[in-house]
Amino acid sequence: MSKYIFNNDTDILEFLEQLRENGIQIWGEGEKIRYRSKNRQLAPETLRILKMAKGQILDFFRMIEKNVIPLTSIQTAYVVGQTAGCELGNINAHYYIEYTIESLDVERLEQMINLVISKNDALRLIVTHEGKASFLDNVPYYSVPVYSLYDGNDREQKRLERSHHRYNYYKWPMFHFCVGKTSGKTSVLHVDFDCIILDAWSAKLLLNEIFSLYYGKDVKFPRISFMNYMRLKTDKGDLEAEEYWKEKVKNMPSFPKLNYQKKFAEVQNVRFDRIECDFSFIETQRLYQKIKNYHFTSAAVISTIFMKTLAQYSETPGLSINVTLFNRQLLHEDVNGILGEFTNNAVISYQEKTDSLLDAIRATQEQMWRLVQYRKFEGSNILKMLSSGRAGKAIMPVVFTCMLEGNVSKVTKKRYSFKEEYAISQTPQVVLDHHVRDDLGYLKISWDYIIDIFDKQYITDIFGAYVNNIKKFMEKY
């Protein structure tokens, strides 16, 4: 019999998880394996495996302890959001994307995915039962499943299956790639992942790495892992930032009071749909030239128009939204190439006044500079200040996730032959998540919203007004 009965870390992890599900907890103590069981006794087969694989299991425990780091506040929020006790909860934070490609070489794609897995520890992340993150050293070769794509129904079925998939935080992997093959040359690549391992910027990096490698391009992998970056990262208390937010929340308006079909606590099935708009390359260029002329940032302009549009439909003229920050501290020269979850969040507000739109944008831009200044301050603390002891409530459920680079090029902004055709996200305690990006060579705006909360025509009308308001800015100013 082989010296090793487990082939890799995931085999051991699955074995231990099966025992835990049966009420048996296993841990290492020096050179001994200890256990606690509801039935007090272990089955003979379990005892046999523990005896034969003692060395492997003890090494596994040491590896997990060696690689352990605390979860970030956002990762912790995602874990909590999976529980049914949270308003708009009982779901994971999840992202799903579909691509089409001609003449896909699945074997080559699979090889490149495995290379990227080996180079990025975030793709080997698990959550321990003690509520920490750890990273597996030795995972099995990831095989990309292939299914036959006979018609649109097969693709739609796969989309339904994967677009809201719920991962087990204690198991590997927390991502999934699969391919639908047609009788012709066209294939569909389905990609989804739990956001506890990757933020939106990292997801973009991941796919760029895989696609670049697939086409034979050189990829420079970071010389620092996500784990080691997090160990270098410091979040020292910032008294100035704390005082700023304590004062700010005193007069901060609440989230947009739109025409919600249900109270948040009444929503049992949290499922999202997406509405989106692609601006042309010419429109995007025109918009960015206007922004440049006023010395604004694209994020300030788009977020202000977003808030102004929501204010037109809100019961109250003032409102606040949750802003996603991609907070990479410059602790290493390769920091921008690391895959992982770097997200922090903060809040910006809008007050409907007689001031011009330009003045409103200036006010937003000033707030955003403050967000940059105090970017190390944990957004979870801001939400705690706002919650006033309302545990489990969705405090700031409208989110602005900005991935704008502020310039576009037809030449450099293409993702090879992989054409993105569909995407959707979901996040616990979020009712509306606005994603805005320009990495495809044009401005793309999308809203992911909870189906049971919004009437479809109502949310479509608001979105249409938003698109028109962006176009008015292009033409009027």
Language model segments and positions:
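Extended, hydrophobic beta-loop-alpha segments that form or line the acyl/peptidyl-thioester binding
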Residues: 120, 124, 207-208, 317-324, ...
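His-Asp-centered acyl/peptidyl-transfer active-site segments
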Residues: 83-93, 110, 121-122, 171, ...
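Histidine-centered acyl-transfer/condensation active-site motif
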Residues: 35-40, 98-102, 170-213, 298, ...
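Acyl-thioester-dependent condensation/acyltransferase catalytic cores
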Residues: 12-14, 83, 117-191, 198-201, ...
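Short amphipathic alpha-helices and their capping loops
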Residues: 62-86, 110-152, 171-173, 224-273
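A short, small/polar-residue-rich loop/turn motif at beta-strand boundaries
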Residues: 2-13, 104-118, 135-172, 242, ...
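N-terminal beta-alpha "docking/capping" segments at the starts of catalytic domains
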Residues: 62-103, 161, 196-197, 209-212, ...
